[in-house]
Amino acid sequence: TELKLMNIGIIPTELCPSECRFCLAPWKSSVEERSGRAMGGEEFRRIAEQAVRFANDRGLIITITGGEPFLELERVLYIISKAKTRVELTTSGYWAANMRTARRVLSRVESVVKDNKSKKFSFSLQVSVDFFHQEVVSSEDGKLREAIPVKNLANLVEAMLRECSLEICLLPKYTRYEDPLVYLLAELERRGLSPRITRKFYNPNLRVSVLGDDGKFDKPALLKAYLSFDSAKKQAFLLYTAVEGIGGASILEFEYQTFKDRTAEFLEQEKGERFPLMGLEVSDDGNVYPGAHALYSWCLGNLLETTLEEIAASLEYDPLIIALAEHPWKIKNIALEAKPELRGELEKASSPLVAIYKILEDDALRLYITKELAGE
């Protein structure tokens, strides 16, 4: 099957200063575990250069995630400097503890972005703002604190709106938990940056329950919007994304009935959703994984031993990749025939994609499914 990739992710580091209980990263390790595996600067440049070149040649979006990318600022700047396509960097904003630091870091990023003269290059700084990053936790001395303070996010956003030309995108989540975006906008208003929503776009495939004068009713969920601010000439972009129940987030309850219904349909029917491979992810140790923030179930190779071109070429003939794109229910059927007891676990999945993830994270079962698909 022909690969139709949209993005390639590059992870400068999988380390993170926060310890969010609901971290989606299923591979996330402790600092002690990661320290022995992470690369030095020159080795990382070798894999980053290859990943960026792969994206440039194919016009793919480069996503820089983590961990927390700004723990390795020099690596981030190197990736941006080499890109000839769109770059989207996601940060928790932990580092913007005060306005001085926010300005200093942003000015370095802005300088490299401005120096990149490629006609097809563009850059967006995306800031996570959700209950999971802003969760209030108890510290060892018994005091309450936010995992990533809203104040830090306000410093980052204010510096970008008032003093920086970079594109900014806020990333809240569809969730039944409290939305700290409200507190962030209130803090910005106290700083003279009163927000106004200028344009809204809704997701018709996801409906949320709200209370109105006539009781409870469902409405399409907000997908994205543009925010304008008083005393600032530029806008911020707002983009809602769903919480997938993988990694630490697998302990969450269903966020919305819509997801649960889709999972039930997928388990019962011989048709439905398809999951073509949309991206590849390159970790800070050179390992390459399939998927964009979802299918980190197995490693496809290491860039110190092979190339992305070779990996991509092999994926076009991979039975699992083909099945994901054309008939993922076959993966589900083979898995349930081999392990009927797995159904109860799959019924808890927050979406059909997460159900597939739960199947493929079992190494032995994944190998068995691959052999069955190849033998058809």
Identify the residue ranges that each predicted region occupies.
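Pocket-edge positions in alpha/beta enzyme catalytic cores
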Residues: 35-39, 68, 300
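Canonical Radical SAM [4Fe-4S] cluster-binding loop centered on the CxxxCxxC motif
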Residues: 1-46, 54, 292
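Radical SAM/AdoMet-radical enzyme domain recognition
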Residues: 45-63, 72-187
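Short acidic donor-binding/metal-coordinating loop in glycosyltransferase active sites
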Residues: 12, 66-67, 129
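Flexible mid-to-C-terminal extensions adjoining Fe-S/redox cofactors in radical SAM and related proteins
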Residues: 285-376
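A C-terminal junction/extension of Radical SAM enzymes
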Residues: 163-291
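A short local loop/turn or secondary-structure capping micro-motif enriched for an aromatic residue
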Residues: 30-32, 87, 273, 296-301
